[in-house]
């Protein structure tokens, strides 16, 4: 007797359902894709008991004839393709012919449809894949599919479904992804007979604001690029909107939602140092690509794709996003960090929170450029005048030379002498008492008046950004600027510290350190980089080694980038250091001459803006 037999169709369908129908959201996805392929201009979804009791979708597409309806629940029956060659030029979302057969085999399935020219609709009911009723019904053109009691005959699968909140969250995310991809379609969603949304217009901003928060769309950076190989359009978020989850990162290929590690990594790399640990940027990106360049027949769920030339796509997407991101003014408005953290905490505690309209006003005001913010700052400054004789000591002359021409010419990245910033003179005039429109707050923050309100700068991370970019430039160009010590310093290192020292020794020399090994784990410091303060040589070197090790453990950084971050962090002026007016002006000018003045090398914000509009609201003027 043969031991290998062909499985019955009902068993094969249940096995197939295990791949295609993993949870109620899988049913929603498959039915929505069929409705879109049918040319629907309106889609209505009704969900009950998180899809366990009911998933119903009504569309006004072209409908089906009764013979087609009987065939559509058979395995590998489809109207989308008729040959393998058509997979290369596929223009529809569905094509495998498995979904309806799989869904009907594990549910009480009802299909009602009416196509153009039919006198009446027909109704077919299935239980566990078996046809139990055929009848006539009244209906407009289109198709209605109802899936009840999902997994009623597969109790093991039903047992592993999550809570209603979790399952409905997956359903909502599925509908959200499709509603954003097809703004020309009217969408309506009901959950347990409660209407959650009804999009009647094709306004993308309306949908973005609903799904992500009021005025959210105004805070996005629009991307629109096209070449002979691909088109890329959509939106990415400003760093003030960054979150620690990837739910708000949506990628599409030819309007098909996909999951792709390469695209996610390209996005992360495009933001680079704007991100702190575990942050992810918002993205809604649509890639248009020749269908022959991508294989979507990788997995039954059709979320994974395989590119013919993945490296080429990455090399095109990365610079487009990077260029768009770096041109923006990323200084967040006051209060945003707290609002986002509070919203993230609420979302983590209750997944349904993300389904409601968020009640924050603006994550990071409408996009503007770095130049706009700097010009706004400069326009509010009084004319530069010479300081009163003797008022700021000898260091003032250095700052006067540095600052005088800065408002009449384009600034280029350069570095001021750090020793000047660190010099303290109690005889200097207090900036708060002058008419400079620049003040130091608690010896931590620099407050500047700008056209739209106030700009607050964290002096430590601002200086850190300046030193970081200077360090990177010096190491890359191999033009160290070393100061020789009159009395060399000797430092004893631990074993692990000495190993790291040996690893980064060449780049320390590029940076301006003149170092010599002196016996077992002993290092002689004979010269230091320009920005190291006299008397702190040994401490700074040891702190840099410690910081380098911490960065290496937590972050995946290239060696020079790690060293530059360690150097800038340990050498920057500290919170609590009193600065003169000229020192603050110099720091601001040097900051805005950097590539990215809005975040420090570790991703912390450098600048916060407080608009007049916000102040007026706080005081009840608006």
UniProtKB/Swiss-Prot annotation:
Key words, A-Z: DNA damage, DNA repair
Any Pfam family matching the protein: MutL_C
GO biological process: mismatch repair
Function: This protein is involved in the repair of mismatches in DNA. It is required for dam-dependent methyl-directed DNA mismatch repair. May act as a 'molecular matchmaker', a protein that promotes the formation of a stable complex between two or more DNA-binding proteins in an ATP-dependent manner without itself being part of a final effector complex.
SMART domains registered for this protein in UniProt: DNA_mis_repair, MutL_C
UniProt KW DNA damage keyword: yes
Homology family: Belongs to the DNA mismatch repair MutL/HexB family.
UniProt xrefs under InterPro entries: DNA_mismatch_repair_CS, DNA_mismatch_repair_MutL, DNA_mismatch_S5_2-like, HATPase_C_sf, MutL/Mlh/PMS, MutL/Mlh/Pms-like, MutL_C, MutL_C_dimsub
Any one Gene Ontology cellular component term annotated for this protein: mismatch repair complex
Alphabetized CDD domains for the sequence: HATPase_MutL-MLH-PMS-like (cd16926), MutL_Trans (cd00782)
Name of the protein this chain belongs to: DNA mismatch repair protein MutL
Gene Ontology MF terms: ATP binding; ATP hydrolysis activity; ATP-dependent DNA damage sensor activity; mismatched DNA binding
Organism encoding this protein: Prosthecochloris aestuarii (strain DSM 271 / SK 413)
């Amino acid at each position: 007797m043969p031991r290998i037999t062909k499985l019955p169709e009902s068993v094969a369908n249940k096995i197939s359902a295990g791949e295609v129908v993993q949870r109620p959201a899988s049913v929603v996805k498959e039915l929505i894709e069929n409705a879109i392929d049918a040319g629907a201009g309106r889609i209505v979804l009704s969900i009950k008991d998180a899809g366990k009791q009911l998933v119903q979708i009504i569309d006004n597409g072209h409908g089906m004839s009764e013979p087609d309806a009987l065939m559509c629940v058979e395995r590998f029956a489809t109207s989308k393709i008729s040959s393998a060659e058509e997979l290369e030029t596929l223009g529809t979302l569905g094509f495998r012919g498995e979904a309806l057969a799989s869904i009907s085999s594990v549910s009480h399935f009802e299909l009602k449809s009416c196509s153009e020219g039919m006198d009446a609709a027909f109704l077919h009911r299935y239980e566990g894949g078996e046809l139990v009723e055929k009848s006539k019904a009244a209906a407009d053109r289109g198709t209605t599919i109802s899936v009840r009691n999902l997994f009623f005959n597969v109790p093991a699968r039903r047992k592993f479904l999550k809570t209603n909140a979790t399952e409905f969250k997956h359903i909502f995310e599925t509908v959200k992804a499709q509603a954003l991809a097809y703004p020309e379609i009217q969408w309506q969603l009901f959950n347990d007979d409660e209407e959650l949304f009804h999009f009647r217009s094709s306004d993308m901003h309306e949908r973005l604001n609903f799904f992500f928060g009021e005025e959210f769309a105004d805070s996005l950076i629009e991307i629109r690029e096209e070449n002979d190989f691909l088109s890329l359009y959509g939106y990415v978020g400003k760093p003030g909107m960054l979150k620690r989850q990837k739910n708000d990162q949506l990628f599409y290929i030819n309007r098909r939602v996909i999951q792709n590690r390469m695209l996610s990594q390209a996005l992360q790399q495009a933001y680079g140092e704007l991100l702190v640990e575990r942050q992810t940027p918002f993205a809604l990106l649509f890639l248009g690509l020749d269908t022959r360049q991508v294989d979507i027949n990788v997995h039954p769920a059709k979320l994974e794709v395989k590119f013919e030339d993945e490296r080429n796509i990455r090399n095109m997407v990365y610079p487009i996003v990077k260029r768009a991101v770096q041109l923006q003014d990323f200084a967040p408005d006051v209060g945003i960090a707290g609002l986002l953290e509070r919203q993230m905490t609420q979302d983590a505690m209750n997944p349904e929170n993300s389904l409601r309209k968020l009640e924050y006003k603006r994550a990071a005001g409408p996009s503007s450029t770095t130049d706009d913010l700097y010009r706004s700052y400069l326009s509010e400054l009084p004319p530069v005048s010479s300081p009163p004789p003797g008022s700021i000591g000898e260091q003032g002359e250095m700052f006067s030379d540095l600052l005088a021409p800065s408002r009449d010419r384009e600034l280029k990245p350069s570095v001021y002498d750090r020793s000047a910033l660190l010099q303290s003179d109690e005889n200097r005039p207090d900036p708060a008492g002058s008419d400079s429109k620049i003040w130091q707050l608690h010896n931590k923050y620099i407050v500047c008046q700008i056209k739209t309100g106030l700009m607050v700068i964290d002096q430590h991370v601002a200086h850190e950004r300046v030193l970081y970019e200077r360090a990177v430039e010096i190491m890359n160009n191999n033009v160290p600027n070393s100061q020789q010590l009159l009395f060399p310093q000797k430092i004893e290192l631990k074993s692990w510290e000495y190993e790291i020292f040996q690893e980064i020794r060449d780049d320390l020399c590029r940076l301006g350190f003149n170092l010599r090994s002196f016996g077992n784990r002993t290092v002689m410091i004979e010269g230091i980089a320009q920005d190291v303060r006299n008397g702190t040589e040994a401490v700074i070197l040891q702190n840099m080694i410690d910081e380098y090790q911490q960065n290496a453990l937590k972050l995946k950084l290239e060696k020079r980038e790690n060293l530059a971050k360690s150097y800038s962090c340990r050498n920057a002026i500290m919170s609590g250091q009193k600065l003169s007016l000229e020192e603050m002006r110099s720091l601001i000018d040097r900051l805005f001459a950097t590539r990215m003045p809005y975040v420090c090398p570790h991703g912390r914000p450098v600048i916060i803006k407080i608009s007049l509009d916000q102040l007026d609201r706080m005081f009840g003027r608006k």
